[in-house]
């Protein structure tokens, strides 16, 4: 988190802790989960035409300027779609971003929040985002 904050302090509007940029990686995930995550991020890049490699990342740091630029009332998504929409809004508003490599380790306790509803919302939601006033 410190590296994300340092990136924002240096003038970047959004710093993303990325599993998929150079130097980032995932530990202890089954191949099927990695494959789903990787192709979901590729899908988002293609539909929204953004350069973020890890659009579903949960580790991020926004500047006040970035958050102030986003129409938060327009983002009614949950789960991964919410994460994607926030990042997309920053880019759509012409602000800067960077991806900072992280090592993502699979949880040792608890269960994933992924559900078919969250997956469907993200899959269809990116098409809605293209038309939204963010």
Give a label for each model feature.
Residues 124-134:
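C-terminal, non-catalytic tails of nucleotide-sugar-dependent glycosyltransferases
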Residues 8, 21, 91-94, 126:
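Generic helix-packing signal
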Residues 70, 88-90, 96, 112, ...:
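Amphipathic alpha-helical interaction segments
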Residues 84:
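DNA-recognition element of transcription regulators
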Residues 94-118, 132-134:
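Unusually extended, aromatic-enriched hydrophobic runs near protein termini
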Residues 1-80, 107-122:
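Acceptor/aglycone-binding surface of glycosyltransferases and processive sugar-polymer synthases
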Residues 50-51, 74-78, 87-105:
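Catalytic donor-sugar/metal-binding loop of nucleotide-sugar-dependent glycosyltransferases
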Residues 14-16, 98, 127:
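Residue-level marker of intrinsically disordered, low-complexity segments enriched
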